[in-house]
Design a protein with these regions (language model features):
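Macromolecular interaction modules
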Residues: 1-112
Length: 112
């Protein structure tokens, strides 16, 4: 089962509270309600705790490089991609794009 991650920041013009309401009311129920999604969770990165290596290079950033990470468990990647190509899928992505910085990326990974 593929796992997708969206790694992103909000646009400077967007407020976190408005985005959180959008997630709760629209995005999370919308994705969880699709036949190809088995799970969808989003995490907000709060702060940098410390280095993750014994000999870090340079100074630690004061803020996390990304504000959010979304994890989407996909049961049928072809069905998801097909949905994203429809008008409804394009509108779904467009509604999310209102909030997200244009450097947002999707990655696909698997558990190690």
């Amino acid at each position: 089962m593929p796992t997708l991650f969206a790694i992103y920041n909000l646009k400077d013009t967007q407020k976190a509270e408005e985005y959180h309401n959008y997630l709760i009311q629209t995005k999370i129920p919308g994705i969880r309600g699709t036949p190809w999604c088995t799970d969808f969770k989003t995490w907000k990165m709060d702060k940098v705790l410390g280095p993750a290596v014994s000999e870090p290079e340079g100074e630690l950033p004061s803020e996390p490089p990304h504000q959010y990470i979304a994890k989407i468990e996909v049961s049928d990647l072809d069905a998801m991609l097909s949905f994203l190509g429809t008008n409804a899928g394009k509108e779904f992505v467009k509604s999310w794009s209102v909030y997200l910085d244009p450097t947002t990326i999707f990655t696909i990974g698997n558990e190690v």
